[in-house]
């Protein structure tokens, strides 16, 4: 008991005298450099690697998948010499969308970085969380491994196109204030192969994926509730990314879109050129949140109709990030014709999102 009290007093004293860290700022004009920027940026507050995609089983059945690794720098004094000091946290989310089930199968994990069990490496993508991992191989392919209770998968994601820099050469504004921004790039049209274990059955899968990598120290305005985001692999070889940051009253604080057409031409759309118009909502029986799962997205003069693979794609991550959000596979039409497939993310509909 004396030892416990001594340890508690030491921890309190450490916290009282600890110097808060200075998080690295996100500023325009920085040139993203690869392969280094594939890796972690531990001086920034928040970072994530996010892969989503559509898979097909041998019998032609569609599945959606999502795996995200978060790295979060805490406010622990960086000069703290203890190997147990939680200076960096690693969090993982994984989900499988199966229309036969009618809802997501998902899991989550979190741990402090250290001891080789959880880390986000610099220099290239190399993230590990127990037996979950995402690693970029020397040939550019990603290997993603998830082992969980109700789902497991081992996937290989092979790039087929150049990196797509979002915003201003990778500087992505997220609000009216200069500091609300991130560094952000995407890798659309990743060819996928591997296997999925679900409902006690192992199946080979192929498909197409989208990978985002984003890092920041201050993303959201204090009046922000959350965001609507979509990333779409277009059938003509193009790629579309769009988002809006929502205020607490439901209005749009900021919006942006990037469209790379099939010939490789990139067009950026500012806040006044991007509009999300909900067409249909789905109300969760678990949280009572109403999500706009079908949306009409306008970028410039082009309209894209977004429809979900299934309505219930809500993910409860309160055990790791404290948030509940909707993250689901979607199809996209342009001018009434099929145009592509991707993912839609809807956050802040249960409670205001905090990063």
Language-model features and meaning:
Residues 2-9:
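Sec-dependent signal peptide recognition
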């Amino acid at each position: 008991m004396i030892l416990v009290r001594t340890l508690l007093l030491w921890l309190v004293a450490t916290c009282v005298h600890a110097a808060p860290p200075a998080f690295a700022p996100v500023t325009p004009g920085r040139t993203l450099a690869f392969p280094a920027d594939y890796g972690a940026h531990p001086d920034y507050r928040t970072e994530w690697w996010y892969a989503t995609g559509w898979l097909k089983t041998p019998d032609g059945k569609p599945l959606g998948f999502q795996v995200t690794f978060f790295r979060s720098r805490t406010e622990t004094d960086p000069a703290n010499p203890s190997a147990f000091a939680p200076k960096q946290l690693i969090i993982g989310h994984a989900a499988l969308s199966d229309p036969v089930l009618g809802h997501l199968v998902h899991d989550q994990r979190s741990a402090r970085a250290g001891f080789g069990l959880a880390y986000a490496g610099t220099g290239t993508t190399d993230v590990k969380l127990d037996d979950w991992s995402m690693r970029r191989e020397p040939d550019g392919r990603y290997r993603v491994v998830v082992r969980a209770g109700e789902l497991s998968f081992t996937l290989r994601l092979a790039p087929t196109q150049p990196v797509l820099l979002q915003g201003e050469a990778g500087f992505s504004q997220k609000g009216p204030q200069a500091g609300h921004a991130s560094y952000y790039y995407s890798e659309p049209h990743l060819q996928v192969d591997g296997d999925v274990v679900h409902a006690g059955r192992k199946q080979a899968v192929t498909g197409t994926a989208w990978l985002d990598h984003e890092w920041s120290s201050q993303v959201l305005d204090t009046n922000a509730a959350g965001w609507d985001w979509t990333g779409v692999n277009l059938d003509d070889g193009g790629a579309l990314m769009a988002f809006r940051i929502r205020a607490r009253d439901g209005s749009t604080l900021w919006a942006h879109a990037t469209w790379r057409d099939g010939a490789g031409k990139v067009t950026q759309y500012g806040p006044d050129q991007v509009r999300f118009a909900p067409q249909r909502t789905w109300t969760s029986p678990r949280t009572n949140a109403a999500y706009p799962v079908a949306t009409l997205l306008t970028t410039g003069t082009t309209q894209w109709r977004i429809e979900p693979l299934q309505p219930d794609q809500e993910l409860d991550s309160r055990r790791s990030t404290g948030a509940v959000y909707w993250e689901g596979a979607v199809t996209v039409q342009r001018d009434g014709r099929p145009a592509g497939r991707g993912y839609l993310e809807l956050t802040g509909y249960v409670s205001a999102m905090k990063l």
